[in-house]
Protein backbone atom coordinates (compact mmCIF):
# COMPACT_ATOMS: atom_id res chain seq x y z
CA UNK A 1 0.00 0.00 0.00
CA UNK A 2 1.46 3.39 -0.90
CA UNK A 3 1.67 6.20 1.58
CA UNK A 4 -0.89 8.23 -0.39
CA UNK A 5 -3.44 5.42 0.11
CA UNK A 6 -2.71 4.92 3.80
CA UNK A 7 -4.32 7.02 6.45
CA UNK A 8 -1.49 9.12 7.79
CA UNK A 9 -1.61 9.76 11.50
CA UNK A 10 -1.05 13.40 12.37
CA UNK A 11 -0.31 14.66 15.85
CA UNK A 12 0.32 18.13 17.20
CA UNK A 13 3.82 19.03 18.31
CA UNK A 14 3.62 19.29 22.13
CA UNK A 15 5.70 22.47 22.06
CA UNK A 16 4.39 24.59 19.16
CA UNK A 17 1.18 22.74 18.16
CA UNK A 18 2.31 22.32 14.51
CA UNK A 19 0.78 19.30 12.74
CA UNK A 20 3.34 16.48 12.49
CA UNK A 21 2.97 13.32 10.41
CA UNK A 22 3.75 10.30 12.61
CA UNK A 23 6.17 8.20 10.56
CA UNK A 24 9.51 6.46 11.15
CA UNK A 25 11.38 9.00 9.02
CA UNK A 26 10.54 11.76 11.52
CA UNK A 27 13.40 11.43 13.99
CA UNK A 28 11.90 14.05 16.32
CA UNK A 29 8.38 12.65 16.68
CA UNK A 30 6.15 13.64 18.41
CA UNK A 31 7.98 16.95 18.02
CA UNK A 32 8.26 18.81 14.72
CA UNK A 33 11.94 19.68 15.10
CA UNK A 34 15.09 19.34 17.19
CA UNK A 35 14.38 22.82 18.59
CA UNK A 36 10.95 21.86 19.94
CA UNK A 37 12.37 18.63 21.35
CA UNK A 38 15.09 20.56 23.23
CA UNK A 39 12.60 23.15 24.52
CA UNK A 40 10.56 20.30 26.03
CA UNK A 41 13.67 18.69 27.52
CA UNK A 42 14.60 22.03 29.08
CA UNK A 43 11.13 22.22 30.66
CA UNK A 44 11.68 18.84 32.33
CA UNK A 45 15.15 19.91 33.51
CA UNK A 46 13.74 23.14 34.98
CA UNK A 47 11.05 21.23 36.88
CA UNK A 48 8.14 22.69 34.89
CA UNK A 49 6.76 19.19 34.39
CA UNK A 50 6.34 16.48 36.98
CA UNK A 51 5.04 12.95 37.07
CA UNK A 52 2.71 12.44 39.98
CA UNK A 53 2.72 9.22 41.91
CA UNK A 54 1.00 7.88 44.95
CA UNK A 55 3.49 7.15 47.65
CA UNK A 56 2.81 4.18 49.83
CA UNK A 57 4.04 4.24 53.37
CA UNK A 58 6.53 1.51 54.06
CA UNK A 59 5.81 -0.85 56.94
CA UNK A 60 7.75 -0.25 60.11
CA UNK A 61 10.46 -2.83 60.67
CA UNK A 62 11.53 -3.58 64.22
CA UNK A 63 15.03 -4.78 65.11
CA UNK A 64 13.96 -8.41 65.71
CA UNK A 65 12.47 -8.46 62.21
CA UNK A 66 15.83 -7.39 60.79
CA UNK A 67 17.73 -10.30 62.35
CA UNK A 68 19.11 -12.87 59.94
CA UNK A 69 17.21 -16.10 59.92
Swiss-Prot record:
HAMAP family: DNA_gyrase_inhibitor_YacG (MF_00649). Belongs to the DNA gyrase inhibitor YacG family. The gene is yacG. This is DNA gyrase inhibitor YacG. Binds 1 zinc ion. Inhibits all the catalytic activities of DNA gyrase by preventing its interaction with DNA. Acts by binding directly to the C-terminal domain of GyrB, which probably disrupts DNA binding by the gyrase. Its cofactor is Zn(2+). Keywords: Metal-binding, Zinc. It comes from Neisseria meningitidis serogroup C / serotype 2a (strain ATCC 700532 / DSM 15464 / FAM18). The keyword Metal-binding applies. Pfam families: YacG. GO terms for molecular function: DNA topoisomerase type II (double strand cut, ATP-hydrolyzing) inhibitor activity; zinc ion binding. Interacts with GyrB. Zn(2+) binds at residues 13, 16, 32, 36. PANTHER family: DNA GYRASE INHIBITOR YACG. One of its GO terms (biological process) is regulation of DNA-templated transcription. Gene3D superfamilies: Erythroid Transcription Factor GATA-1, subunit A. The keyword Metal-binding applies. InterPro entries: DNA_gyrase_inhibitor_YacG, Znf_NHR/GATA.
